[in-house]
Amino acid sequence: MQNLTVAILAGGKSSRMGQNKALLPLGTMKIIEHLVTNLRPIASELLLVANTDEYAFLNLPVYRDRFPGQGPLAGIETALRVAFNEKVYITACDLPLLPAEIPRFLAENTEDYDVTVLAYKGKIEPLIGIYRKSIYPVVEKHLILRKNKIIDFYPQVKVKIINFEQLPENLQREEFLLNVNTPADYEKLLKIFSLKE
């Protein structure tokens, strides 16, 4: 898509997995490579936010957090600060099955909202969302105040929530939202992936 930055946040500690989940194998590639492959077609700019040099093999720009240790909101701050485009799709490195059509749908339906996020079963998914670069000062201020929860800044901006059921029917598959946080999640991912192949 024209004028869309895609930012993959890969700065987490992967503590529940015991190793870097983004680098776990999935078929012939690593999890993070699947994300990059899926999202590249919709990105006019593609970048990673990570505090490690382990992703050099992807040949993508990698930016480090300005507020290390302050969670995913710090990753959003970095992405908004460095992004070339006004619209920035923020996602996590542990959503390898999410098709690019979902962020494309969100981006096409942002209207004049500052944040457009997906919600599933009543729960907001802040790392499946389009964020406008113009809200950067609000995000930065929250981090300076050590208010690290993403949705805590939502009341200060215009937020549009798109429910899972509002997506086109072919995108309403629960497996697309599988977060790979634990060894059990990884086993589930491998099963789903082997069925797809």
Swiss-Prot record:
Main location class: cytoplasm
Chain positions recorded as GTP binding sites: L9, A10, G11, K21, D65, D94
Subcellular location: Cytoplasm
Keyword Nucleotide-binding among record annotations: yes
EC supergroup of this enzyme: transferase
Amino-acid positions noted as binding Mg(2+) in the UniProt annotation, renumbered to this chain: D94
Short name of any one Pfam family annotated for the protein: NTP_transf_3
Keyword S-adenosyl-L-methionine: no
EC annotation from Swiss-Prot or TrEMBL: 2.7.7.77
Keywords, alphabetical: Cytoplasm, GTP-binding, Magnesium, Metal-binding, Molybdenum cofactor biosynthesis, Nucleotide-binding, Transferase
Record GO cellular component, one term: cytoplasm
Record protein name field: Probable molybdenum cofactor guanylyltransferase
Native organism: Carboxydothermus hydrogenoformans (strain ATCC BAA-161 / DSM 6008 / Z-2901)
Lineage: Bacteria, Bacillati, Bacillota, Clostridia, Thermoanaerobacterales
